[in-house]
């Protein structure tokens, strides 16, 4: 009989560090966001904010797209929104842009918006409840899904 190898306990100095859970990360991310309900998100967009739909293509095809949103899937988000990155979208003009991130249910968008804030994009936030809440509120959705924007030329890691 063999004994399973145990993983080393993460330490900070002499103290053991309990690894964070995904719920801990979500609470921390949301603590720095001025999250918007769908109606407030629409008002923000009408006032100049940029709405980003980070849902994967299969979800957009199944449910439709948010009218007027830029489609940037989650794995490209930071590169597209960082105004210093050669792979940025045209809307990424400076660090003062208000980015409103929308995923399907409002979970990954919170983590994504916090990541944008870590890049110095302090006005980044997300939609409470995501696309599901947007659609339930009767806000504009396009069907069938429109094609994604082509990616700008430039390097991408």
Label every model-predicted segment.
Residues 1-50, 57-99, 107-157:
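Rhodanese-like catalytic fold shared by cysteine-dependent sulfurtransferases
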């Amino acid at each position: 009989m063999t004994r399973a190898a145990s993983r080393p306990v993460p330490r900070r100095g002499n103290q053991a560090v309990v690894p964070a859970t995904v719920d801990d990360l979500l609470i921390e991310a949301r603590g720095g966001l001025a999250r918007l309900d769908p109606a407030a998100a629409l008002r923000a967009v009408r006032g100049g904010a940029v709405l980003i739909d980070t849902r994967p293509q299969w979800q957009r095809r199944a449910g439709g797209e948010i009218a007027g949103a830029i489609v940037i899937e989650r794995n490209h988000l930071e590169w597209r929104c960082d105004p210093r990155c050669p792979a940025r979208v045209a809307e990424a003009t400076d660090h003062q842009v208000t980015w409103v991130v929308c995923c399907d249910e409002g979970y990954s968008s919170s983590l994504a918006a916090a990541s944008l804030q870590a890049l110095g994009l302090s006005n980044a936030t997300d939609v409470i409840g995501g696309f599901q809440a947007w659609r339930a509120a009767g806000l504009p959705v396009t069907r069938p899904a429109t094609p994604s924007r082509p990616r700008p030329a430039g390097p991408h890691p």
